[in-house]
UniProtKB/Swiss-Prot annotation:
GO cellular component: cytosol
UniProt organism field: Deinococcus radiodurans (strain ATCC 13939 / DSM 20539 / JCM 16871 / CCUG 27074 / LMG 4051 / NBRC 15346 / NCIMB 9279 / VKM B-1422 / R1)
Function: Catalyzes the conversion of acetate into acetyl-CoA (AcCoA), an essential intermediate at the junction of anabolic and catabolic pathways. AcsA undergoes a two-step reaction. In the first half reaction, AcsA combines acetate with ATP to form acetyl-adenylate (AcAMP) intermediate. In the second half reaction, it can then transfer the acetyl group from AcAMP to the sulfhydryl group of CoA, forming the product AcCoA.
Superkingdom, natural source: Bacteria
Matches recorded under PANTHER family: ACETYL-COENZYME A SYNTHETASE, ACETYL-COENZYME A SYNTHETASE 1
Lineage of the species this protein comes from: Bacteria, Thermotogati, Deinococcota, Deinococci, Deinococcales
Name of this chain's protein: Acetyl-coenzyme A synthetase
Length: 649
């Protein structure tokens, strides 16, 4: 018996369809026919499909078996041995790419550093030798707490080269969050920097590292990169070591360790519903194959591309699509340390123009911020080098999608929206450019080997043009293997909600063409007068109004309707609020039941430095409750006070 609350009402229907140009289609890596052939093979003959992909890469020992699936645990390329750092560096040098640029790094202060593949290999070998000198061996955990500088990528690859398990903690996290993650992983080494730069000022990291180290007795050493050259308040002799003292004197030769395909590669902590961080554990072989294939196909990668994923490496997007995926493909990667509005809102477009970026992969929250400041700023820059745009991190509103396509892409660049998670390791849903038309706001079609479905809580499948719970019906190579130190949490969170399928925690709908649209986290679905509404749809309707640049919608308890709709809205520069017009617009786009009961006009939303809106704080404010929880990760904690003082309209 299906409970009515198993369905999510799909009420906002986007009808625009954007076709790739004939020129783009002619040169695309994967055509529609090729996608359909390979997708069918990936489901019907998965061993053959994944063997073919994996054999593009170097294996020190071939596997005995492609997949061993003992639900809910998968092992991929069983018995095989490889090394992801070897594949990202040595293999590319051997392919003749030694003189090709691997990383173009730009600091917020304008400093530029470039590493060829041969140079990057030498730096990684030196760092790997340094780690071994400090007693780090395969299987040891190493925590990175760093700004987005080349040494962060070098440290990642050095860990992977010797089989150490890296755990990267975003540089915006607090002392307690850092200490919790060090202790959970039982890391013996912390790699950090004196400081990074953000909005023209040094953001000290060593101070937080020192405080966290006091709470983490497992740490033996703290390796410090001198980024800002600021005076340090504290230095513990014997524990603290300068990167340049230890790394620079090492040999630039190092033999990569042959690692079992299932050897842990990294742990990345993500917030759970309980507030306790979950250490998502990924392994070497499957993650390598998944990120290699998706980078190549989703971004239609070509030899001369200059590829820029704007994510910090503290997040999964930075792991998979700033470092591992592009380098495995021999691409040239742009990295930028700093804020998108330093010194002004033209900084991103200056980087695109200066470095002739061809592929840009960024987040909807950044796109909406650029929208807020109008078309004129990007119009000052030459963006003609761009040929492909990508979106990641959250569902993108159709209006933001269209602005990105029109203003940044000049109506010539396909936009690939991508749905995936820390847990999935690589992109799961997207619209391959050149193969299919795009539908603004829709994540699109499944990637190779991915078999999604929409279900009710009791496992009943839901048809097209209806909303339900997004699940994945079979294992895939880059999937997480466990929650570090808590396998029961892995079983319960991902495979225990609905029997025999991976539970994504997202609501979605699928149209008659098979395109999936994410309507929001299951936790963010509102129950208004018996209707389950995705907050994403209401936000998209608000952003479609010409006065609005960004919106966040939450629910608050209502004695009559169950929940009422509360909207926090940012206006376009120079526009004024007309709450009646906004309510009427939502009513016409979706229906009267989605009309916001309260609208708050905001000058900013509570976001982390990665751009995620912290909706739990908005829910607390909407309900009139005091703000509870760690606010140290917010870009601007004072925004909560301003929102609290804002009157409802």
């Amino acid at each position: 018996m299906t409970h009515p609350n198993d369905h999510i009402d799909a009420m906002l229907h986007e009808t625009r369809v954007i076709h790739p140009s004939a020129e783009f289609q002619a040169g695309t890596r994967v055509s529609r026919a090729e996608y359909e052939r390979r997708y069918r093979q990936s489901l019907d003959q998965p061993d053959d499909f994944w063997s073919e992909v994996a054999h593009d890469l170097h294996w020190m020992k071939d596997w005995d078996r492609v997949l061993d699936w003992q639900e809910p645990h998968a092992q991929w390329f069983v018995g095989g041995q490889t090394n992801i750092a070897y594949n990202a560096l040595d293999r590319n040098v051997q392919r003749g790419l030694g003189d090709k640029r691997a990383i173009i790094w730009e600091g917020e202060d304008g400093e530029v550093r470039t590493y060829t593949y041969a140079e990057l290999l030498r730096e990684v070998c030196k760092a790997a030798n340094a780690l071994e000198e400090l007693g780090v061996v395969a299987g040891d955990r190493v925590t990175l707490y760093m700004p987005l500088i080349p040494e962060a990528a070098i440290a990642m690859l050095a860990c992977a080269r010797i089989g150490a398990v890296h755990s990267i903690v975003f540089g915006g996290f607090s002392v307690s969050a850092l200490a919790d993650r060090i202790n959970n992983a039982q890391s013996k080494l912390l790699i950090t920097a004196d400081a990074g730069y953000r909005r023209g000022k040094p953001v000290t990291l060593k101070i937080n590292a020192d405080e966290a180290a006091k709470l983490a007795p497992c740490l033996e050493h703290v390796l410090v990169v001198k980024r800002a050259g600021i005076p340090l308040e504290w230095w513990t002799e014997g524990r603290d070591l300068w990167w340049h003292d230890v790394v620079d004197r090492q040999s630039d030769q190092h033999e990569a360790t042959a690692l079992d395909s299932e050897h842990p590669l990294f742990i990345l902590y993500t917030s759970g519903s309980t507030g306790a961080p979950k250490g998502v554990q990924h392994t070497t072989g499957g993650y390598m194959v998944g990120t290699y294939l998706t980078t190549q196909t989703v971004f239609d990668l070509r030899d001369d591309d200059i590829y820029w994923c704007t994510a910090d490496i503290g997040w999964i997007t930075g792991h998979s699509y700033s470092v591992y995926g592009p380098l495995l493909n021999g691409a040239t990667v742009v990295m930028y340390e700093g804020a998108p509005n330093q010194p002004d809102w033209g900084r991103f477009w200056d980087i695109v123009q200066k470095h002739r970026v061809t592929i840009l992969y960024t987040a909807p929250t950044a796109i909406r911020s650029f929208m807020q400041h109008g078309d004129e700023i990007p119009g000052r820059y030459d963006l003609a080098s761009l040929r492909l745009l990508g979106s990641v991190g959250e569902p993108i509103n159709p209006e933001a999608w269209m602005w990105y396509y029109r203003v940044i892409g000049g109506e010539r660049c396909p936009v690939v929206d991508t749905w995936w998670q820390t847990e999935t390791g690589s992109i799961m849903l997207t619209t391959l450019p050149g193969a299919f038309p795009s539908k603004p706001g829709s994540a699109g079609l499944p990637m190779f080997g991915v078999e999604p479905a929409l279900m009710t809580r009791d496992g009943e499948e839901i048809g097209d043009d209806d909303g339900g719970l997004l699940v994945i019906k079979r294992p895939w190579p880059s999937m997480l293997r466990t929650v570090y130190g808590d396998d029961e949490r892995y079983r319960k969170s991902y495979w225990g909600e609905i029997p025999h399928v991976y539970f994504a925690g997202d609501g979605a709908r699928r149209d008659h063409d098979g395109y999936y649209t994410i309507v929001g986290r299951v936790d963010d679905v509102l129950n208004v007068s018996g209707h389950r509404l995705g907050t994403m749809e209401i936000e998209s309707a608000l952003v479609a109004h010409p006065d609005v640049s960004e919106a966040a919608v939450v629910g608050r308890p209502d004695p009559v309707k169950g929940e009422s709709v509360v909207a926090y809205v940012l206006l376009q520069d120079g526009h004024t609020a007309d709450p009646a017009a906004l309510r009427a617009h939502v009513s016409s786009e979706i229906g009267a039941l989605a009309r916001p009961d309260a609208i708050y006009i905001a000058d900013a939303l509570p976001k982390t430095r990665s751009g995620k809106i912290m909706r739990r704080f908005l829910r607390q404010l909407a309900a009139g409750q005091p703000v509870q929880g760690d606010t140290s990760t917010l870009e601007d904690p004072t925004v909560l006070e301003r929102l609290q003082a804002s009157p409802a309209l």
